[in-house]
Design a protein with these regions (language model features):
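N-terminal leader/linker segments that precede catalytic domains of diphosphate-processing enzymes
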Residues: 1-288
Length: 288
């Protein structure tokens, strides 16, 4: 008798690639996952995580700017769902990197008003202690700046993985008056890196990068400024990308669209399309 295969359900998630100007180009903020976490242990990733029920609640919607464009390039996603993905992106970036994409009561970026940074730091601690995000935002008279997020990618975990995510990736620029820092709960380090440097460190075996993170860094690598990167993100198509899974000999591999084992997806191109898992780390290998 053939046993039915159960595919784990998808959990909606948001990820933010936070960038800032650097000499001759840009840097991106990455966090190192703790060794004991259930997903992507020890890997360097962008801040992000699963959507919470409160991300789609009406009270948080009333505290958002930029609602008119949240569905842009999100396909069949409904308005409320699209807003929730954006709210989750802002919340997760705040929790994991200490960066709040919001306007203060004067309509300026949070951080530009006296007392803002102290409120941001205390609010982050309160959020970690269980204070509802909407309650915190409303009390400080902040407005979440959903329009500062630009969608650029949509990644879906392969069917075979035990924990699967339907993740939208957003690009954002670090507000000038704020400084990113890792949270210390799910992550053990936070670092700004040039995309090319992160790729080089991964090739050298110094850090671990999951295939979607690697691919994003390769996409950001050519840009000479944050303006160029944001212009690209605003204009790029956002196809649904679900990597393939298999084995090459006894080695576990993941393939991306365009690999010999996986059909191309219009609007998606990657410099590397095949990754092997060796010693707990993914590394790009030649496609067969």
């Amino acid at each position: 008798m053939t046993r039915a295969v159960t595919i784990p359900p998808l959990a909606p998630a948001s990820t933010v690639a936070l960038i800032r100007p650097a000499a001759g180009g840009l840097e991106v903020f990455m966090v190192k996952r703790h060794t004991a976490v259930a997903v992507l242990a020890s890997a360097y990733v962008f801040p992000g995580g699963q959507l919470a029920l409160a991300d789609s609640a009406g009270d948080i919607a009333a505290l958002c700017d930029g609602l008119s464009g949240v569905r842009d390039r999100m396909g069949s996603v409904l308005d409320d769902e699209a807003r929730a993905f954006h709210v989750a992106a802002v919340r997760e970036l705040y929790e994991e990197a200490g960066i709040l994409l919001a306007r203060n009561r004067d309509g300026k970026a949070v951080g530009e008003r006296s007392g803002d940074i102290d409120a941001v730091d205390k609010g982050r601690d309160a959020l970690a202690a269980g204070r509802p995000f909407a309650t915190l935002v409303a009390a400080e008279r902040w407005r979440l700046a959903l329009d500062w997020l630009t969608l650029f990618a949509h990644w879906v975990t392969p069917d075979i993985e035990p924990r699967r995510f339907d993740a939208y990736f957003f690009l954002a620029v670090e507000p000038e008056a704020q400084d990113a820092s890792h949270c210390g709960r799910e992550t053990s380090a936070g670092v700004w890196m040039r995309p090319a440097d992160a790729i080089a460190r991964c090739r050298a075996g110094e850090i671990a990068l999951p295939p979607p993170t690697w691919t994003t860094l390769r996409q950001l690598e050519p840009f000479g400024s944050v303006d160029e990167a944001m212009a690209w993100a605003r204009s790029t198509t956002v196809p649904r990308i679900q990597p393939g899974f298999g084995f090459q000999g006894t080695t576990r591999i993941v393939t991306l669209p365009g690999d010999s084992a996986l059909a191309p997806v219009p609007g998606f191109a990657a410099k590397e399309t095949r990754f092997a898992l060796e010693n707990g780390r993914w590394r790009p290998i030649e496609s067969l």
